[in-house]
């Protein structure tokens, strides 16, 4: 026994001599105890701070610039620094500022020990080289070998995992999380170490994931059951979503006494934390919040038993990175400690808590999307007087699908044959503008004020003095982009008469219209009805009271000429409108009278001839008898 103690004492002395060979920090400044290890995917630096100190990490780039380290999925940096626990910095070999030199990964980290007032107590630079050149630990003032092997994942704090807590996908769920179990017994007084949830990639077609569910003790929710979001109400779908199922309850599928995360393809994830889990980890449920958006993204729902977060994948501090054909979305849920201040000190009974949430999606999947495109509002129109560009054209038929060109004029029409006229507003895209026709008329020349004239529309309505009234056509809403910019009407072909001789003027007819653009304002509208009151109100805009302004008048590209089917010019016996006369019956009457007169004349002539011949014969006979 004495020999064994002597051997142990000699070993301790040898170890002390070995430690004495290492460099010491400057006098009066405590050294930093740190170590690092190399894993399969990254490197990990562990620093043991003195009580009351916090550790801050900074990475150094190849030019010597220092950058403070935070949890960053883009740079593959993770930091964990909890009270009375080692400060851990993890970096992936593909992370930011990791340099490749001769087959080794080099990362320079600047370590600072911070006092409670924010000042730096001591700072030290550490160079991490993986794979390590040897198995010697980097040393500060004391050599502290690792007590446990480092995990290969970048999350270094101690945590407990159970494969039974993993649940497969619910509605649109791509991957699920390994949830933390209740913390084990504390090794000493004070707050317990932080518990960090580990994220595992869970393939959809993994056979042992189907049917996995929460332990029965986690489903003993006393009150305030929160319905779980699932695609169907079946037990299998509920359990695969990581929720509890009880057919005897009013809400058969509900969240259990744990932390449940559901990632949805439509752009958000749901995080539910139970009161029982908060008690197990010695935290206050009301103090749980998102780490990067504590005020902007509060819980969507709070009850006495649960806190529910509805987090968009693109907001609330959620980070995203692309690795191969996968998208990684990450966020963190933390809990602030509840501090009680007394007259001579402050205490807390809360532990620290940090839950890393990660949703993994396949970037190569084809998913349906629904997009709503909202056109920007049109600018407010400016109403003022100005020139209008109008066009009057004649259609080939009643469909108004094609129109005559300038080279087609003059057009030839039979009397009473319809002429299809369209007036439209050019170079205007304001849908609220309304084209209004005031007066439309016809003249025998290209001069709009030449006499004679015949009205087609009076105050926008068909002229009532015509037995063949102009027909104003309604426009189909679907056939024109700006329906209110068009006006159409149909005219029966006619010809002008010589007022003196009452004979048809064999000439051309030109069409004209006066128009304006109306813009509604306030309760007033631009719609008009063809009534006597409207005609009186708008009478002043017609050409009867004067010559209309040139900018308001539009004419047809060319004239329209009429053609009589019998190629003869009728002479009319009756007075009235040339359009009320029909030359065909009058012609037959004249011809009939001429025929009768001719027959009578011939009969009279023949009778008289025979009478004179009889008298001559009687005269000759009497003469012969006298001789």
From Swiss-Prot:
This is Zona pellucida sperm-binding protein 1. The keyword Signal applies. Expressed in oocytes (at protein level). The modification Pyrrolidone carboxylic acid is found at residue 21. The chain crosses the membrane at residues 586-606. SUPFAM superfamilies: Trefoil. One of its GO terms (cellular component) is extracellular region. Proteolytically cleaved before the transmembrane segment to yield the secreted ectodomain incorporated in the zona pellucida. InterPro entries: P_trefoil_CS, P_trefoil_dom, P_trefoil_dom_sf, Zona_Pellucida_Domain_gp, ZP-C, ZP-C_dom, ZP-N, ZP1/4_Ig-like. It comes from Oryctolagus cuniculus.
């Amino acid at each position: 026994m004495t020999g064994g103690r002597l051997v142990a004492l000699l070993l301790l002395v040898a170890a002390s001599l070995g430690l004495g060979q290492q460099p010491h920090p400057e006098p009066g400044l405590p050294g930093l105890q740190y170590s690092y290890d190399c894993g399969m995917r990254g490197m990990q630096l562990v620093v043991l701070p003195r009580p009351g100190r916090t550790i801050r990490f900074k990475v150094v780039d190849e030019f010597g610039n220092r950058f403070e380290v935070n949890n960053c999925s883009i740079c593959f940096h993770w930091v964990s620094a909890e009270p009375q626990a080692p400060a851990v910095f993890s970096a992936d070999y593909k992370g930011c500022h990791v340099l490749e030199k001769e087959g080794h990964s080099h990362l320079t980290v600047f370590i600072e020990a911070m006092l409670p007032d924010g000042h730096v107590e001591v700072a030290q630079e550490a160079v991490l080289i993986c794979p390590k050149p040897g198995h010697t630990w980097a040393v500060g003032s004391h050599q502290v070998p690792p007590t446990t092997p480092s995990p290969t994942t970048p999350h270094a704090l101690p945590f407990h995992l159970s494969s039974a807590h993993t649940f497969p996908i619910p509605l649109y769920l791509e991957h699920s999380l390994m949830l933390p179990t209740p913390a084990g017994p504390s090794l000493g007084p004070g707050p317990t170490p932080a518990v960090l949830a580990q994220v595992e990639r869970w393939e959809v077609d993994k056979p042992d994931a189907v049917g996995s569910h929460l332990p029965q003790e986690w489903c003993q929710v006393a009150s305030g059951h929160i319905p779980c979001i699932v695609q169907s109400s079946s037990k299998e779908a509920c359990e695969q979503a990581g929720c509890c199922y009880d057919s005897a309850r009013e809400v058969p599928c509900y969240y259990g006494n744990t932390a449940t995360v559901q990632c949805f393809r439509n752009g958000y994830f749901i995080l539910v934390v139970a009161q029982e889990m908060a008690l197990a980890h010695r935290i206050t449920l009301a103090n749980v919040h998102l780490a990067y958006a504590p005020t902007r993204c509060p819980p969507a729902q709070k009850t006495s038993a649960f806190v529910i977060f509805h987090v968009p994948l693109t907001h609330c501090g959620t980070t995203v990175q692309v690795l191969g054909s996968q998208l990684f979305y990450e966020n963190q849920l933390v809990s602030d400690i509840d501090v009680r201040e007394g007259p001579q000190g402050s205490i807390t009974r809360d532990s620290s808590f940090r839950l890393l949430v990660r949703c993994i999606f396949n970037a190569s999947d084809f998913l349906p999307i629904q997009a709503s495109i909202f056109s920007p509002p049109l600018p407010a129109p400016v109403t003022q007087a100005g020139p209008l560009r109008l066009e009057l054209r004649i259609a080939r038929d009643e469909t108004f699908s094609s129109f005559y060109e300038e080279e087609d004029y003059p057009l030839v029409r039979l009397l009473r044959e319809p002429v299809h006229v369209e007036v439209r507003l050019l170079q205007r895209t304001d849908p609220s503008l309304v084209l209004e026709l005031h007066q439309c008329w016809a003249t025998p020349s290209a001069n709009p004020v030449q006499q004679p004239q015949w009205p087609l529309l009076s105050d926008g309505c068909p002229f009532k003095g015509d037995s063949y009234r102009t027909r104003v056509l309604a426009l189909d809403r679907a056939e024109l982009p700006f329906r209110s910019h068009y006006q159409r009407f149909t005219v029966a072909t006619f010809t002008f008469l010589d007022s003196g001789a009452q004979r048809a003027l064999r000439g051309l007819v030109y069409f004209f219209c006066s128009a304006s653009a109306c813009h509604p304002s306030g309760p007033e509208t631009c719609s008009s009805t063809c009534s006597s009151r409207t005609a009186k109100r708008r009478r002043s805009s017609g050409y009867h009271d004067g010559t209309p302004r040139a900018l308001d008048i539009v004419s047809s590209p060319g004239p329209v000429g009429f053609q009589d089917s019998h190629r003869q010019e009728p002479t009319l016996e009756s007075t009235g409108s040339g359009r009320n006369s029909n030359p065909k019956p009058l012609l037959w009457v004249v011809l009939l009278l001429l025929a009768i007169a001719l027959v009578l004349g011939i009969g009279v002539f023949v009778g008289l001839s025979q009478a004179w011949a009889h008298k001559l014969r009687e005269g000759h006979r009497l003469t012969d008898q006298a001789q």
